[in-house]
């Protein structure tokens, strides 16, 4: 049996790299998706971290390797090697910080320089809970995404708003997963981002520019695969073997 629990079918693994300036809450997005939690005391990473998580789609199960990169200028030289073999890039900015939005152009250019023009890229405006401090409008984000031919979504990691939808959208665009776009298990009708409800977390969908339709997941999948998490500092080896819990199931990370 494969790691994903599908008889005879090996678990397909995809590398997603998160990019953006320091303090745009890239780590918070990953933590919200991986653990469904938010840590107000979380410190900025130094170097590169990664977590793994399985996703249960209509077409099967996939493994996501979520690479969290540091946004500090002095650590930029570490990042290109992790972009090169990625299946997708998530470029994050803070809607309350216009400079972080402006810098996303450079991040997207870096991705295409290292990975090529066919890489999947999603532009994410985070921290919509701070609407009173907003410096970048939804329309500006949509225009930039359209001009750069990338997908766009706004999120709120603190409350979980649109975080699942972000990963569903990325998963639907991954190689071999295109058919999952037509096999949704949930209603993915659009949400207007201009007036998010502070007291609720929408699971219905997202309002975004995108050349593709969305993919969905069951809200409570049978997570039989043991997810692995590894924290990595500056001295990161190019290849690791991670063993999952007591099953000693090898998962190769590159």
Swiss-Prot record:
A motif (Switch 1) lies at residues 32-50. GTP binds at residues 23-28, 39-40, 42, 71, 126-127, 129, 157-158. Its cofactor is Mg(2+). Its EC number is 3.6.5.2. Residues 1-174 are annotated as: Required for centrosome localization. One of its GO terms (molecular function) is GTP binding. A motif (Switch 2) lies at residues 69-88. Keywords: Cytoplasm, Cytoskeleton, GTP-binding, Hydrolase, Magnesium, Metal-binding, Nucleotide-binding, Nucleus, Phosphoprotein. It comes from the Eukaryota. The modification O-AMP-tyrosine is found at residue 82. GO terms for biological process: intra-Golgi vesicle-mediated transport; intracellular protein transport; mitotic cell cycle; protein localization to Golgi membrane; regulation of centrosome duplication; response to xenobiotic stimulus; retrograde transport, endosome to Golgi; retrograde vesicle-mediated transport, Golgi to endoplasmic reticulum. Changing residue 25 to G: No GTP binding. No GTP binding. Transmembrane segments: none annotated. InterPro entries: P-loop_NTPase, Rab, Small_GTP-bd, Small_GTPase. It is found in: Nucleus; Cytoplasm; Cytoplasm, Cytoskeleton, Microtubule organizing center, Centrosome. Gene3D superfamilies: P-loop containing nucleotide triphosphate hydrolases. Mg(2+) binds at residues 27, 68. Its main location: nucleus. The small GTPases Rab are key regulators of intracellular membrane trafficking, from the formation of transport vesicles to their fusion with membranes. Rabs cycle between an inactive GDP-bound form and an active GTP-bound form that is able to recruit to membranes different sets of downstream effectors directly responsible for vesicle formation, movement, tethering and fusion. RAB6C may be involved in the regulation of centrosome duplication and cell cycle progression. Belongs to the small GTPase superfamily. Rab family. Switch 1, switch 2 and the interswitch regions are characteristic of Rab GTPases and mediate the interactions with Rab downstream effectors. The switch regions undergo conformational changes upon nucleotide binding which drives interaction with specific sets of effector proteins, with most effectors only binding to GTP-bound Rab. NCBIfam families: small_GTP. Primate-specific retrogene derived from isoform 2 of RAB6A transcript. This is Ras-related protein Rab-6C. The lineage of its organism: Eukaryota, Metazoa, Chordata, Craniata, Vertebrata.
């Amino acid at each position: 049996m494969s790691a994903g629990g599908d008889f005879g079918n090996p678990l397909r693994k995809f590398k997603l790299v998160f990019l953006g300036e320091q303090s745009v809450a890239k780590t918070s997005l990953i933590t919200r998706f991986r653990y469904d939690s938010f840590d107000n005391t979380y410190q900025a990473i130094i170097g590169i971290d990664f977590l793994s998580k399985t996703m249960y789609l209509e077409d099967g199960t996939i493994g996501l390797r979520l690479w969290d990169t540091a946004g500090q200028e002095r650590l930029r030289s570490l990042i290109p090697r992790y972009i090169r073999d990625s299946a997708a890039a998530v470029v994050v900015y803070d809607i309350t910080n216009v400079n972080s939005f402006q810098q996303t152009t450079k991040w997207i250019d870096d991705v295409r320089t290292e990975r090529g023009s066919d890489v999947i890229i999603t532009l994410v405006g985070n921290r919509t809970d701070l609407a009173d401090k907003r410096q970048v409008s939804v329309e500006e984000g949509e225009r930039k995404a359209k001009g750069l031919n990338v997908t766009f979504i706004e999120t709120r990691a603190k409350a979980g708003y649109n975080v699942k939808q972000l990963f569903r959208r990325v998963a639907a665009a991954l190689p071999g997963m295109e058919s999952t776009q037509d096999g949704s298990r949930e209603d993915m009708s659009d949400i207007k981002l201009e007036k998010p409800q502070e007291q609720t977390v929408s699971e219905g969908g997202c309002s975004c520019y995108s050349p593709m339709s969305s993919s969905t997941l069951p809200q409570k999948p049978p997570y039989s695969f043991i997810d692995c998490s590894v924290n990595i500092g500056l001295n990161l080896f190019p290849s690791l073997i991670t063993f999952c819990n007591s099953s000693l199931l090898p998962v190769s990370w590159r």
